[in-house]
């Protein structure tokens, strides 16, 4: 129990000093898009330890985890496969899509990353100005990484729930929600001390990271299905255990925090949970909280 809590505390401390795109600030530096290559290397060394130059990946791939299968009534007609009723057909839906990479020298526990609202796994892989993301940093430290697109998001868009994908113009809402700064008179005004790159190309790249939901009737996340995501997340953790024989460190961000706590109900293979600015935390009398305690996470 003490070992797991110590591991969680150490990871939380290490991660706190890292810049997550749109969510970090540091009054001691103003990292700009025109950083030189040497400055980028220095930053990587300061955050993730020494870098050996080339990042060597021993294995990588993609798989789906969790989900369900829907079967329609009727009989499928192979001569009329385009008919609109879907009679007798199946739909594989509500799963997570997982990209994984295993470093050549794997020395640590595997790490499973779940993004927040409006995001996909891309947010863990790079920054808007093209620097290494958290996944590369932890690969360099000997951890295999498993990067999730949650159900109804990104490459896991197949859904059991009908809904609309919003075409509203929402870029400035995301800019404000991520607490990057203020958008005034058509201009980006970053918060004082922010390390967010304030050049035109980086802001463009940030806005293009935004990823809509399928199977949603609201662009405010009001009908987000916490349990569906938690079950897919737990299935991912179980798959990692089947492949590696190791429990996983679960890293969540923002909206992903909720499913992260709940996932502990559905798997016995979470070594630690590191929640970065979670959208909420379970109350001490909740089932999620008690489960985390009982399983010594």
Describe every region a protein language model picked out:
Residues 18-22:
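C-terminal motif of bacterial Sec signal peptides marking the signal peptidase cleavage site
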Residues 45-106:
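N-terminal cap/lid segment of alpha/beta-hydrolase-fold proteins
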Residues 108-116:
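Short beta-strand element of the alpha/beta-hydrolase
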Residues 115-127:
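Active-site glycine-rich loops that stabilize anionic/oxyanionic intermediates
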Residues 131-157:
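Conserved alpha/beta-hydrolase
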Residues 228-248:
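Conserved acidic catalytic loop of the alpha/beta-hydrolase fold
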Residues 251-260:
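Gly/Ala-rich beta-loop-alpha elbow adjacent to hydrolase catalytic centers
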Residues 278-297:
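The feature captures the conserved acid-bearing segment of alpha/beta-hydrolase catalytic domains
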């Amino acid at each position: 129990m003490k070992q797991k809590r110590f591991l969680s505390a150490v990871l939380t401390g290490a991660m706190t000093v890292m810049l997550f795109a749109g969510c970090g600030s540091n009054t001691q530096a103003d990292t700009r898009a025109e950083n030189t290559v040497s400055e980028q290397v220095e930053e990587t060394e300061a955050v993730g330890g020494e870098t050996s130059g080339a990042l060597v990946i021993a294995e990588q791939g993609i798989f789906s985890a969790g989900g369900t299968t829907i079967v329609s009534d009727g009989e499928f007609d192979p001569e009329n496969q385009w008919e609109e009723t879907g009679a007798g057909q199946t739909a594989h839906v509500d799963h997570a899509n997982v990209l994984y990479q295993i470093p050549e020298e794997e020395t640590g526990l595997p790490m499973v990353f779940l993004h927040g609202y409006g995001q996909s796994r891309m947010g863990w892989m790079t920054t808007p100005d093209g620097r290494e993301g958290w996944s590369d940093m932890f690969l360099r430290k000997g951890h295999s990484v498993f990067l999730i697109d949650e159900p109804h998001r990104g490459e896991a868009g197949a859904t059991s729930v009908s809904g609309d994908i919003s075409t509203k113009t929402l870029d400035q809402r995301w800019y404000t929600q991520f607490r990057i700064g203020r958008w005034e008179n058509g201009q980006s005004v970053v918060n004082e001390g922010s390390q967010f790159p304030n050049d035109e190309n980086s802001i463009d790249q940030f806005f293009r990271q935004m990823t809509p939901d399928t199977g949603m009737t609201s662009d405010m996340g009001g009908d987000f299905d916490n349990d569906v995501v938690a079950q897919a997340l737990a299935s991912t953790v179980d798959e990692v255990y089947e492949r590696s024989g190791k429990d996983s460190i679960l890293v969540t961000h923002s909206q992903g925090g909720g499913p992260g706590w709940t996932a502990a109900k559905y798997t016995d293979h979470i070594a630690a949970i590191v929640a970065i600015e979670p959208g909420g935390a379970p109350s001490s009398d909740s089932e999620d909280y008690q489960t985390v305690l009982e399983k010594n996470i």
